[in-house]
Every structure is written in structure tokens, then in C-alpha cells.
Amino acid sequence: MSELPPGFAVSPRNQQTFKSHYITNDSSPTCLGLQVDSIASLPYRDPARQEKRLPIRILKMLTAHTSHILHPEYLQPLSSAPVSIELDAKKSPLALLAQTCSQIGKPDPPPSSKLGSLSSSSHGDKDSRSSSSSLKSGEHQNLDDKSSFKPYSKTGSECRKEGAGINSSADKAGFRVPNGSSSSVTCTSLPPHAPSPRASSPQQTSGQSHTHRQSQSPLSQKTAHLQTTHMDSKAAGSDPGNDSSSSGSDRNGKKDSDHNKSSLDVVQIANSSHARASVNSSSASSSSSPQPDSKTDSQPPQPSLGTGHIAPVSPFKPGHSVFPLPSSTMGYHGSIVGAYTGYPSQFVPGLDPAKSSLGMGVPGKHPSSSPLTGASPPSFMQGLCRDPYCLTYPNAPHLGGSNCSSCVHDPSSALKSGFPLMYPTHHLHSLHPSSLSSSATSSLSHPLYTYGFMLPNETLPHACNWVSVGGPCDKRFATSEELLAHLRTHTALPGVDGKLLSGYPSSVSSAASCHLHLPPPSSPGALPSSLSLRGSPGLGLARYHPYGKAHLPGAPSLPMHSLPATAPYYSPYALYSQRLGSASALGYQ
């Protein structure tokens, strides 16, 4: 009563009128409208009309929002069935937004359960769209659903090619993966007029197309597709030891799929995480097949890899860009528990297959790798040791010690100095101090500057990485002495006599120790384990510190040496060597 306008007099008569209008059941807007219409026929100054006047505030409260009352279909909670959201999407943009948000990143249900939910929800509703969508979803598995956003779905042809790669890899290792986990998840049921493209004989093709024509309902169609996929896997696995027959059938399958691409409808498959999971499971189970025969190939050859494989493209080897997916069940010692294994043999040119420590002695194949597989060339990444504390480079075997039993240090690859050392050694790793001077070939095989990639077949292997204001130098030289003489032209100051620099020994090991803040090989504390780009904790102090001294004291095990005569040559390059190395190792040289 205190919120009434000032012109509204409070009297017992008005109180009775107020109670009769707002507290009793006559307070609905329709009753009020009838009473107002009957009173409106009276003259304006009639006392009966004046005493029944209502405040404007209460009238606004009663009549303002009657036209905006929500319909009951919007007040109902959104069900899990996609049809109700589809039907509401025609009327409400909010329902369309809710449908889009609920389907992002969520895998599609299998065709049988989705068909059941569609048919059960469209019993009471005679809308033509719901019935047609239920039929379409049974046959084509969400053929072009424009109201749902599926960013990770693939087309049917890629799915079938991926399935071909899965079946060939699984059957070749002698371990047949169940069809429910590999093919039926990734490739949904085909349309009735499309035969399976991976047929190995014309009779089988006619039988499959006849089976597909006979099956009309989606459930029987899915069963027929499972049968044909099983027949395909049996046909592909009929000769698991012969690689040429499997790859030939895969090529025939690709030709058939290209031929049928015009007649095939686009089949939307499930989320690609399901496809990748099934690929991983099939390749893992094929790699871990318990066969004593070591000649059985665990991965398909390069031509028979399907186009659905996701692989990084290496700029260093343009011909080989598809890496097979690693297996997750091959165990070996070290903390990297078998997560990165199984690269093809063309990435491992110089390793001895007899030194492979796994039971799958595939010729020319080395199972070790590293977590940086996609970021670096495979011919460099294959040689990293599987021991997490032994990260030396096998092409420089003088750096490795005899205590690391898991390294594959092949002396035949010593002269093939492919990609230089990138990983640091652990500071507790025991090495041979005398092995550097034991063989001249091993010391010559190690590159002069251990940053920057050098191609294995490069005629001029030594490149100048000096970066000035005008850009990098990028000149190449055949020997390290020529490169050292060229570097003196960069570092020589105008007022410094060249005789000061001539007394410094110009050999490979001493130059490398100079530019990496290491003692020369003749000093008593020489540690060849420190020849690395990102050094152990003592070498990490040798980076360029703008507010510190030029030479910081290192770890006790790594004594820093002083260069009194060669300071004009030594200090400018040594301060920036770590930064130049990290830039060139990432491909910016």
C-alpha cells in the first residue's frame, strides 16, 4: 500500500476494492478487462467510475508482458535425442545454438541406436522432415546434416582407404584384428548401390554388390557390410608373408575406389578420434603379435600405406613423407615406454640390424626414436638412444661410453656424419676420455660446429653460420681448416695483428672445444661428453648474459679455460654460439 501513487486515497472502501481485484480469483486480466469495459460506459466524472480506477503502475504490471509469454515447448528441457532439437531449430535460434554446441566434439552414435532413437521420437510426430531424416540416417549415416557442425569428419573414400591400410598391416603380421574395432567403427555402412571398393576378385565384387542390393533395412545393411569387410580382411590376409600381393590388392582397391568415387555418396563417419584410436589399436596389436619368426614385417611397405595416415612432412627428405603410426605395446628399458617405435627402413640407412635389441629383427629397421619425431628429420631422430640419460649421437661413436648398453653405436656409420649432435649428455654419464685420440676417423667424422643440420650427401659439409647485420654468411667449405680460416676474416679486428691468432691450433677437436667453451683435448680435464648444443647444467651458464661477465665459472667437472692471446677472436663468436645453434637447429639457418 505504500507504493501506491499519491492520488490514490486510502479508505476502507478503496481497500475493499483493492482486495476484491488483486487477492481474490477475479484478479485475472480477462476479468479485469470485462469490469473495466462495463465501467468505461459510465461518464468520466461518475463516482462509481472514479472509485474503481486502478493505479497505472499496477496496470502496467498486469498487462505489459502478456504478449511475451513463452510457449510451453521452450520451457521443456532439451532431450538427448537429436530430432527434438532439430524440430525446435526451425523455430528458435536458441535451440539451434544448443544443438550446435551439444554436437561439437561429440562422436555420433552408431547407426542402430540412432535409428532407434529417431524412430521412437518420431512416432508421435508426423513431421515429414523427421521421417525423412530417420530414413536417411539409416542409409547414409547423417548425409549432409546442415544443422550440425562436424569439423573432424572424413569422406567415405578416405575412410575406406584407411581401412585398407589397417587390414593389410594387421593381416601381414599374422594377427587379425576383430572387425568391430577397426573397420566397422571407422567405415559405416555403404549405400545399397555401391559395392565395396577393396575387392580382390570380380566374383567377390559381384557377390558383395548382390548382398548390398538385397539388404534394404539399415540393420541388415550394416550386417552385410561387416560380412564383406570380414571377407576383405580374409582375402587380404590370405598370404601374410608376401608383401607384393597385399600391396597389389591395395593398389587395385585404390583404383576401384577412384572408379566408384562418382557413384558413391558422401558417407559421414564418426569423429576422427575414433578412427585414430582404431588405427592405433590395430597397428599396436599387429606390431605385438606373438610370432617367433623375425622375418615377418610388422608394418606395411611404403606404397601400401593408406592416404588417411596423418604424417608430418619432412623438408629434408622430400620422397618419404608418410610415417607409420607407432605402437604402444612394445616395451623396452628406459623411461620412454615404447611410445615411439617402428619407422620404415629407408629412414635408417646405416644401422646394423643385428644390434637391434627387440625381438622383431626386421632388416634395416631400428625401433628407437624420440619425442621430437615430427620436428626433426627421421634420419637424425632414428639414432637417438633409448636410454633417457644417454642422449648421444651414434654417428659420433667416440662420444659414447661402454657403460651404455642400450645405445646402438655402429662404427660403419662413423663416416656418414648425417645430422650432428643435438641432445646433451647427462652430467653423470661416464665416457672414455681417451677415445677421442684413439681413432682419427672418429674425430674427423664429428662436424666442426655441432649446431645446424648438414645434409648427408652434401659435397661441402662445413657451412659458415656467421650472422652479421647483413644476414647470415652461409658459405660452405670442404674442410674444417678452410672454414676456420674463413671465420678469422669475420672475427679479425682492424688493429689486431694476425700473428696473435696463428699460434692457436687449427684442428677439428680444438676448434670445436674453442667454440663450445671446452678445454682443448691436450688439457687434463678434457671431457668429450660436453660436445653438445644444449650442454649439461655447467654449460648452460655459458650462454650470452647481457648483464654478466663474459666467462662465467662452470660446474666443477667442466673447467673453463682462459684464452689470453686469442680473446679478440674467441669472445664475439663464443657468446653467440648457443643462440645461433638453437636458431639453426630449428631450421632458420
From Swiss-Prot:
Amino acid composition bias (Low complexity), ranges on this chain: 113-122, 196-206, 237-250, 272-299
InterPro entries in the record: Elbow/Noc_ZnFinger (IPR051520), Tscrpt_rep_NocA-like (IPR022129), Znf_C2H2_type (IPR013087)
Mapped zinc finger ranges (C2H2-type): 462-490
Gene3D superfamilies: Classic Zinc Finger
Compartments reported by the entry: Nucleus; Cytoplasm
Biased composition, class Basic and acidic residues, residue ranges: 137-148, 251-262
One Pfam family linked to the record: nlz1
GO function terms (MF aspect): DNA binding; histone deacetylase binding; zinc ion binding
Subunit architecture: Self-associates. Interacts with nlz2. May interact with Groucho corepressor proteins.
Family according to the record: Belongs to the Elbow/Noc family.
Functional summary from the UniProt entry: Transcriptional corepressor which does not bind directly to DNA and may regulate transcription through recruitment of histone deacetylases to gene promoters. Required for segmental gene expression during hindbrain development. May regulate cell adhesion, migration and proliferation.
Protein name per UniProt: Zinc finger protein 703
